[in-house]
Amino acid sequence: MDICRLCLRGVSGAQMCLQIFDVDSGESKVAEVLRQHFWFEVLPNDEISKVICNVCWTQVSEFHQFYVSIQEAQVIYATTSKFKQDPEMVNTSWPEEVLMPADVLAVDNDVGAQINVNPLDELDLSQPMSPEDSKVGIKTERQSPDMELLFEDANNEQDEDYEDDEDDDTDDLIVTRSGRKRKRDVAKPAKTKRGTVSVGRKGKEKMVVKRGPPKRIFKMERLPPFCKEDEELIKRYIVMGCELCIFLAEDFDGIREHFKDKHPDERPYIKCCGRKLNKRCLIQEHARRHENPEYIKCKDCGKVFANSSVLRAHWLVHHVPDEECDFQCEDCGKRFSRRNLLELHKGSHVPVNERKFICPQCPKHNAFATEYHMQVHISMQHRKAANICHVCGKKIKDKAVFEKHVRLHFEESGPRIKCPRPDCESWLKDEDNLKQHLRRHNDEGKLFICSECGKSCKNSRALIGHKRYSHSNVIYTCEQCGKTFKKDISLKEHMAQHTGEPLYKCPFCPRTFNSNANMHSHKKKMHPVEWDIWRKTKTGSSQKVLPSAQVAQMFRDDADVAAIANDYSG
């Protein structure tokens, strides 16, 4: 399993990672960004790791873009010409305009805007900017890690941090980074795309941005310091033990001291539920999830996540309103909240026959629009070995799904759950299947139209299946007769006709089948009562997939029976 070079966490199957260095040239823009902002250097032959997880890279990329925008603003300020103040505009009030603090101001390259700050607070401009760094200007939000999740108005937060002096009705105060307060210069504004540039008393320009409608931001409220309740909660659910040796500590401070003494080359951590926890706040968050499994839950869709970082990434992708998404696709008009999400989406518009990046590990030779898309595919599909069920031989990559699958072979699942909708007669295996089933009903009434043929589908999953089956160029060819199929399972069932080995067995009688559809038809026709009872009450699977060893044993048993019959007949 790969680990992220920054957070040193294992990269799970559901989490994407990015190669820091190019495989061929050994060069990387990612490494340059990391070298600029971190105290350690990542080398092409790094012994720890050569990949960075998508969560870490998203945060680093956003900060780097913010850093570049501030650097550009300071360069503009240092090179601006001097203007004179218009005395008629000194006492003019602007009720709908607010001078934004520098740490939340976004500067675009095409806007000639200057920020009015104290020269003593200027950044060090001795470092040259790379051409790539000067291309991006993006808004950022501050994130406080490991907190309770809630949504608040971004402007409320700004009003608390930057309060106006109530005793002064005419002059506004600006708080500089050094903590000093000074009056704001007001002058005749000049219109720009993003706002208004006002000329101050000393001829310096400053950016005045009109406050738009309040935006919902993903905010995490800071939790109080560790208390006895948190310590008791952690002791109740988490064992403070060293995974590298036999050692138990009272708390995480004891683990830190132990690692410092016995494992100085390792970063202190504990392990619980298969996850490495290397910070006290992560341990606290994990303990709260033991106490309340829905502690980290999306308030928009109800989906539950393992940690707050993944929840934040989910919210940015799925729940940011379109009017608050600043990056729009030129081909389809879809909007995104982050530039990297837009770049990831653009690959979907590249025709399949023009995709030049071929996965070297795929037997299907899947093609991708960019190298980044291919690396994401490799990270999710090929870097983690699939789990193979020792009972039926099924391959399952997700660990939780695999463990649930194995348990069903030896344990009886709960009773079937009926869909709560009055117009649906479906019975589902468990709560997870019910949640997935309810998404197919499309209560919102959205239209899912195929862009290729105009067919209307009930939900997004049906649309994806339609495109994959009807408009995909991927085919599966039988090596013995040359017949082609659209689905992998269709080829597998076809090959059973060549080999003579059955794939399925009826759960109600000894009959076997090569096709799942034939077995399903057999159950409804020959066992209607058993089938109806199973749909509503019976536990377990509605079919039996035969492993190859069991099939071979069946053929040996048939051969033995035939031999005995021949002996008696002779």
From Swiss-Prot:
Residues 132-145 have a biased composition (Basic and acidic residues). Residues 178-194 have a biased composition (Basic residues). It comes from the Eukaryota. Signal peptide: none annotated. Keywords: Activator, DNA-binding, Meiosis, Metal-binding, Nucleus, Repeat, Transcription, Transcription regulation, Zinc, Zinc-finger. GO terms for molecular function: cis-regulatory region sequence-specific DNA binding; DNA-binding transcription factor activity; zinc ion binding. A zinc finger (C2H2-type) spans 240-263, 296-318, 327-349, 387-409, 417-441, 448-471, 476-498, 504-527. GO terms for biological process: cellularization; egg activation; female meiotic nuclear division; homologous chromosome segregation; pole cell formation; positive regulation of transcription by RNA polymerase II; regulation of transcription by RNA polymerase II. InterPro entries: TF_Grauzone, Znf_AD, Znf_C2H2_sf, Znf_C2H2_type. PROSITE patterns: ZAD, ZINC_FINGER_C2H2_1, ZINC_FINGER_C2H2_2. Residues 2-80 form the ZAD domain. Gene3D superfamilies: 3.40.1800.20, Classic Zinc Finger. Zn(2+) binds at C4, C7, C53, C56. Homodimer; at the zf-AD. The N-terminal zf-AD is an atypical treble-clef like zinc binding domain which enables dimerization, and appears not to have any DNA-binding ability. DNA binding is achieved through the zinc fingers at the C-terminus. This is Transcription factor grauzone. It comes from Drosophila melanogaster. The gene is grau.
